[in-house]
Amino acid sequence: MYIIAGLGNPGKEYEGTRHNVGFMVIDALSKKLGIEVSRLKFKSLMGEGHFKGEKVILLKPQTFMNLSGEALYDAVNFYKIPLENVIVVYDDKDLEVGKIRIRRKGSSGGHNGMNSIIYLLNSEDFPRVRIGIGKPEDGDLVRHVLGRFSDEEKKVIDEAVERAAEAVIDIMENGIEHAMSRFNG
């Protein structure tokens, strides 16, 4: 069994923002795996299905970014799932736009959604797929993460979202080491 959580902020006003690339990846996975993400449970929009005989839960926490851990904590405790089968997908300002980085575990890197998850799960030992959104040119991080991609960036991000969805599938199918060697550039 796997829980895949894509981080973002709920609401139409946040759709397409840099901070919501995690939601975009869940939408891509929803299509690829045929799992509808529409039920409200665990403070999230969720969908449940199967991939290669394994149960898969897709989550889009509706708590707002800084409280993402509340949603994931509820789901992990309900299903009693080992943390190595929890995959978190989120934006990373320290990676250039469209770059993907997969890690087996690690710190939050200053990402508040990840801070919340690590704090409430009391562990850094779960896989994550990070998608680069680049650094703000003017230094205003809040405006940057809540801002939209330029037309040029959008093309790169659309491809990155598809690659990130493929990376998650690769983790489930072939393990994290395989996915890291295939997708970390």
Swiss-Prot record:
<feature type="binding site">
    <location>
        <position position="66"/>
    </location>
    <ligand>
        <name>tRNA</name>
    </ligand>
</feature>
<feature type="binding site">
    <location>
        <position position="112"/>
    </location>
    <ligand>
        <name>tRNA</name>
    </ligand>
</feature>
<dbReference type="GO" id="GO:0005737">
    <property type="term" value="C:cytoplasm"/>
</dbReference>
<feature type="site" description="Stabilizes the basic form of H active site to accept a proton">
    <location>
        <position position="91"/>
    </location>
</feature>
<dbReference type="GO" id="GO:0000049">
    <property type="term" value="F:tRNA binding"/>
</dbReference>
<feature type="binding site">
    <location>
        <position position="14"/>
    </location>
    <ligand>
        <name>tRNA</name>
    </ligand>
</feature>
<comment type="function">
    <text>Catalyzes the release of premature peptidyl moieties from peptidyl-tRNA molecules trapped in stalled 50S ribosomal subunits, and thus maintains levels of free tRNAs and 50S ribosomes.</text>
</comment>
<dbReference type="GO" id="GO:0072344">
    <property type="term" value="P:rescue of stalled ribosome"/>
</dbReference>
<keyword id="KW-0820">tRNA-binding</keyword>
<feature type="site" description="Discriminates between blocked and unblocked aminoacyl-tRNA">
    <location>
        <position position="9"/>
    </location>
</feature>
<dbReference type="InterPro" id="IPR018171">
    <property type="entry name" value="Pept_tRNA_hydro_CS"/>
</dbReference>
<comment type="similarity">
    <text>Belongs to the PTH family.</text>
</comment>
<keyword id="KW-0378">Hydrolase</keyword>
<keyword id="KW-0694">RNA-binding</keyword>
<dbReference type="GO" id="GO:0004045">
    <property type="term" value="F:peptidyl-tRNA hydrolase activity"/>
</dbReference>
<feature type="binding site">
    <location>
        <position position="64"/>
    </location>
    <ligand>
        <name>tRNA</name>
    </ligand>
</feature>
<feature type="active site" description="Proton acceptor">
    <location>
        <position position="19"/>
    </location>
</feature>
<dbReference type="InterPro" id="IPR036416">
    <property type="entry name" value="Pept_tRNA_hydro_sf"/>
</dbReference>
<protein>
    <recommendedName>
        <fullName>Peptidyl-tRNA hydrolase</fullName>
        <ecNumber>3.1.1.29</ecNumber>
    </recommendedName>
</protein>
<comment type="subunit">
    <text>Monomer.</text>
</comment>
<dbReference type="Pfam" id="PF01195">
    <property type="entry name" value="Pept_tRNA_hydro"/>
</dbReference>
<dbReference type="InterPro" id="IPR001328">
    <property type="entry name" value="Pept_tRNA_hydro"/>
</dbReference>
<keyword id="KW-0963">Cytoplasm</keyword>
<comment type="function">
    <text>Hydrolyzes ribosome-free peptidyl-tRNAs (with 1 or more amino acids incorporated), which drop off the ribosome during protein synthesis, or as a result of ribosome stalling.</text>
</comment>
<dbReference type="GO" id="GO:0006515">
    <property type="term" value="P:protein quality control for misfolded or incompletely synthesized proteins"/>
</dbReference>
